[in-house]
Structures are given as structure tokens and as C-alpha cells.
């Protein structure tokens, strides 16, 4: 009888234990969900750091919640922490080995420049979702970034079989063709694009580059100018146009375009090396346009950012034009010091150019 009573007591205890466990799990789940909801609110308002903190707490409470792992991976991507995003997606993969998960992992590896890993996961994703154009495009990009342009073209062709109007794949394929100097093949694709009454500034850039290769500088400039009308702050287009103007000896127009370039570079926060080159090119354009004072100002800006023998040499000529022979002589010495292999040529230019005869006589004996 005692044993019988004890049995009932044990059963009652077990029921109570199970009830408490279920209640505890429910509480954890509710708390985890509340953190996930808080994270969603933070995410919507661009507070990604706070969203990550809330999702991390949710994961600690419910580590098998796939949605939370995925959300944190997406949030890490927003903060450009792609290495952490990959780790979270790999956790998701344990529970959700879908094409979407594999494709997301492949994309993050692509950004991290781990191209073999990117291809491995993207190829698996494509096997599961063969019509997903983004996976195929990213696979092609992985080859392009490694400069395997032929393989990239093959992959872009596969993407275009899925969607013949996927313009980013078409544009990237043309870039690869131009890298391989297959200008005739690229030209056919570009012309077909315009024949189909499609229009894009990027295609104008490609067509301009092809025309430049074929020596049609004025026609190329026309395409670049049309593209600039669409994208007036595109530095690449502006540089192409400026280079064409220089080739055509239209130096005043070139200088005007290069002024736009350096203004945009300052606005967009380009690297000091890139700005230095373009301040120098502006200075040289102004020199050719006989605007000595402005040329001096911009060449000096270039040298301040990143001293180079080339722009010291150009500034030598500008200072000589302005009759600052002492300053010009110092710049010539600096150019020769920075690039000894060209020292003789630098001196020879001033020796052989009649307009610098006075400067040469004043300075060359000291060099």
C-alpha cells in the first residue's frame, strides 16, 4: 500500500516538473520573440548595432530559432561585417540547407574575396534554384574579380540564357570582352542593344571606349558627353571626356571638365592619391591653355597631396613661364631626385626647347 501511494506521489511530481519545464520553455520562447521584435524595430529605423544586440540575446535564449540567426546575418551585412554574416548563415544552413541560404553564403564570400568558397556555395544554390539570376550573376563575378574573363563570359552567357534582358550580366560580359580586347565582339553586343531601342549611359561609355580604340576620338567624345548629360556626377565619364578633349587639343574645354572632376572628388571623398593625379592633370590642362597662375595652384595642390616627379617637372615649366627661375630650378632638382632614371630627359627638355632658353641658362649649371 505504501508503494502504491509512493507511485502516485512520483507521478504527481513528474507532472509538476513537466509543467514547470513547459512553462519555463514558453517563457523563454516569449522572451526570445520579444527580443526579435525589438530587433525588428531597431532594424527598420537603421539602428543596426542595437538590432544585433537584441538578436544576440534572442539567440542565447532560443539558439535553434533559424529566423533569428538569419535576421542577425542580414543585419551584419547592413553593417558590412560580412565575416560575421557568413558565420550566422552557416548556422542557418544546419537547419535550412535551401538555395536561398547557400546563395546568401556565396554572396558574402564573394564580398570577402574568398572566391573558391563563393563558387562552391553559389554552384550548390544554382543546382537547387537554377533560374535564380542573381546566383548566376554572382558566380560570374567571382571569375571576373579573379580576372578569369573567359570563364566569366561563359558564366554570364548562362545567366543571359535564364534572362536575356538581365542588363547587369550583359554589361559585365561586355566589360570582360573589352578587358580581353575583343572589341569587335563587344561592338556587336553594344550595337544590338541600341538597335533594340534600349538606352543606358553605361552602354554609351562602352561604345565610346570602342570608338576610342578605333581612333574615332570625336565620336567617342560625343558618346561620353551624352552619357554625362544623364549622369553628370560620374567621374569615370568625365575623365573619359577630358582625355578626349586633351587628345583633340581643346585645352580650355578640357580644363573646365577637369575642374568638375576635382570638385566631385573632394565632394565624394576620393583617396588623396587619386585626387593628386587629377589635380595634376588639371594643372597640366591649364598649362596647355596658357593659364599659368591657375596651373601653378593646381600642380601645387597635387604635390601637396602626393609628391611625384611628373608633376614637379610640369610645375618646373609653369614656374619658368612665370619667371620664377629659382623656384623652377628647385622643382627640377626635386623631379630628378624622385625619378633619377628620367633626370637626363627632364634636363634635356628644357635644353632643347627655345622658349626655356633663359631659364636653362639661369639654372642648368646648378643642377
Question: Where are the model-predicted features located?
Answer:
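Helix-start (N-cap) detector for alpha-helical repeat units in TPR-like alpha-solenoids
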Residues: 31-33, 66-67, 99-100, 133-134, ...
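Structural marker of alpha-solenoid helical repeat scaffolds
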Residues: 61, 94-95, 128, 162, ...
